[in-house]
Structure formats: structure tokens, C-alpha cells
Amino acid sequence: MNQERVFKVLLGPHVSEKATVLADSKKQFVFKVATDATKLEIKKAVESLFDVKVAAVNTLNVQGKTKRTARGLGKRNDWKKAYIALQPGQDLDFSGSAE
């Protein structure tokens, strides 16, 4: 997988209360990913970007909410979320600080 596709697959971490609990307790991390990304692409992107070993990838499609606007009803975009489980002894560091 080329470097350009790696950055297009992973859109960023998804920060929520549930994601924080999973990261602390089970070493599972949640990312927003491209809607056309496959589990294998997501696994390779995380492994190459963060230098960790991925044990499992679970994905789900999140439906966009319907919202009221001044002109009637509108709909937010659908998006895809990936739960990344790391192998034992691995950890992700989002701060990017070199020690």
C-alpha cells in the first residue's frame, strides 16, 4: 500500500467516552476511516503508521443524522468507524513525542 493511500484510509481518531474506556481497559482504539476502506487496508495502514501489530479490526457504518435547518430537513454524511485491537504488549501513542 502506498503512503498516499495510508493517509486517505485513516481520517483520524474518534474520541468519545466509549472509545476512551476501550483504550484504557482493552487496548482497543477507534478511528474514523474512509467509507471505501477494507479491514485489510485499515490494518496495514495502522501497522505502517504507528509501528504496532494489529490483532483484529472491526468496522461499522454510522448513518448520518437527520437535522432540522432553516430550509427544512438536512442530513449529515454517513461515515465509517473502525475498532482496532492491538496484540498484547503493543500500545498506540497519539502525542507523537519522541523520547
From Swiss-Prot:
* Keyword list, A-Z: Ribonucleoprotein, Ribosomal protein, RNA-binding, rRNA-binding
Query: One of this protein's GO BP terms?
Result: translation
Gene3D superfamilies, A to Z: 3.30.70.330
InterPro entries to which the protein is assigned, alphabetical: Nucleotide-bd_a/b_plait_sf, Ribosomal_uL23-like, Ribosomal_uL23/eL15/eS24_sf
This entry carries the following GO cellular component terms, namely: ribonucleoprotein complex; ribosome
Task: Specify the superkingdom.
Answer: Bacteria
Select a single GO molecular function from the record's annotations and give it.
rRNA binding
Record's PANTHER family? 60S RIBOSOMAL PROTEIN L23A
Similarity comment: Belongs to the universal ribosomal protein uL23 family.
This chain's function reads: One of the early assembly proteins it binds 23S rRNA. One of the proteins that surrounds the polypeptide exit tunnel on the outside of the ribosome. Forms the main docking site for trigger factor binding to the ribosome.
Subunit organization: Part of the 50S ribosomal subunit. Contacts protein L29, and trigger factor when it is bound to the ribosome.
Q: What is this protein called?
A: Large ribosomal subunit protein uL23
Organism field? Stutzerimonas stutzeri (strain A1501) (Pseudomonas stutzeri)
